[in-house]
Amino acid sequence: MRVLERMYRSPLGRMMSIVAEALAKFQKPFMVYGYVDPISGRFRKYTRISSTATIMNEKRLSIGDYVWVWHYSILDATEGLVIEEGCQIGAWAGIFTHGSEHSIRLLGSDFVHVPNTLREGYTRGAVRLGAYTFVGAGSVILPGVTIGKGCLIGTGTLVAKDVPDFSVVVGCPGKIKGSTLDIDKKFFLESDFSRTYFEPQAVFEIKKRLTAP
């Protein structure tokens, strides 16, 4: 492990993360190691978030450890955003918990004078990403969506409704095209990942699929 990574994961990590976030304002895009979860106050030393990622209403963001958020992505936590352990979010992805797509027509020029909480037609809804879900670059997740654990959201996918665990979702609008358990089954044919697989209970299902006719 590189010296810098060891320092990030040491007791100095929290302070180094704060300094890195400050320097990010003046530097080219880079990954910031470590993040203090606003909800729990815990330091996620293995989480990495790009210096160019935008977090809206950060105090309503709950984020697990081992999370990766790449360059120029938007995390809108206005109505509550939960990103569970191990999720990865590609570049230029957008996760939104509120929107004004109807409200601007209904309120017209009055829109800017009405507080967010009172705007009629405003779209609101918390978003949750289940553990070890991958969100491809350029994908958009709309307000109110819950995505299960172990999912694969393809590049450029628009997710407008809930997604069950272990789903493969692609397209605009996004549609379920398969299961990551079937994808992972192919890897289990080459090597046994029982020890490291993120969800031990799913290993039984994968192995059952290996023996299915």
Question: Residue ranges of each PLM-predicted region?
Answer:
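Short, functionally important structural connectors and interaction interfaces within domains
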Residues: 35, 47, 53-55, 119, ...
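An N-terminal domain-cap segment
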Residues: 38, 43-44, 55, 61
